[in-house]
Amino acid sequence: LLRDGGEMVCLIKPQFEAGREKVGKKGVVRDKAVHEEVIERIIEFASQNGFFVKNLEYSPIKGPEGNIEYLVYIRKDETGGVDAAVDIKAVVDAAHGELDK
């Protein structure tokens, strides 16, 4: 899929990663805690499977139904890991502060 040192930006769509019980009307996830949980799981999976997580940001564009989505920047690196500057809570808080208006 990606050679060592290769980089990619992946879109995290919480509405598809959260359990059904955590998804609201029209498939929208509004709970910040659910967003944090989904992102933590994805970042943990990536870092344990040969990817280094370089950055995390929220998408400035909401999904068609109003979902907040996130972008994670990763590099193929057998040692894995997460950059110390990646702050899931801060990114989720900023996303909700900016996009939940």
Language-model segment annotations:
Residues 58-69:
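Conserved catalytic loop of SAM-dependent methyltransferase domains
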Residues 5-12:
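Conserved beta-strand signature within the Rossmann-like core of class I S-adenosyl-L-methionine
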Residues 1-3:
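Rossmann-fold NAD(P) dinucleotide-binding segment
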Residues 35-49:
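Short alpha-helix
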Residues 50-60:
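Conserved S-adenosyl-L-methionine
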Residues 14-31:
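Short, glycine-/aromatic-enriched active-site segment of Class I SAM-dependent methyltransferases
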Residues 14-18, 61-62, 77-79:
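Conserved nucleotide-binding/hydrolysis micro-motifs of P-loop NTPases
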Residues 68-101:
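Flexible, glycine-/basic-rich loop-and-beta segments that form/coincide
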